[in-house]
Amino acid sequence: IDLGIVDPRTMIKIDDTNIGIKEGKNAGLWTVGVARWSTYMNVLPENINNMNNVVIEERLEKSKEKLKQSKPDFIIETLDELPNIIETINIYNSENMNL
């Protein structure tokens, strides 16, 4: 299948696992790791209300540290941050810059 993609750096791989981030890096894509609700937080969204905020923050930090191992271009907590990341990527692409 030819998708007509000339430059893979115009695409973004968003994932919550190191395997997914590595897939994106191997394809030459920008990569974004999402920490909250990541597999590495080990919590279901429906159970979050029953958890202590300190525990949630500890798990979130551990999730970020785990995601850093795959060296994504960006790590965000939630997808709400994605528009800012896309804007940054567009600036880098327009100026032919890499991170």
Question: Which sequence ranges carry the predicted segments?
Answer:
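Asp-based, Mg2+/Mn2+-dependent phosphohydrolase catalytic module
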Residues: 1-99
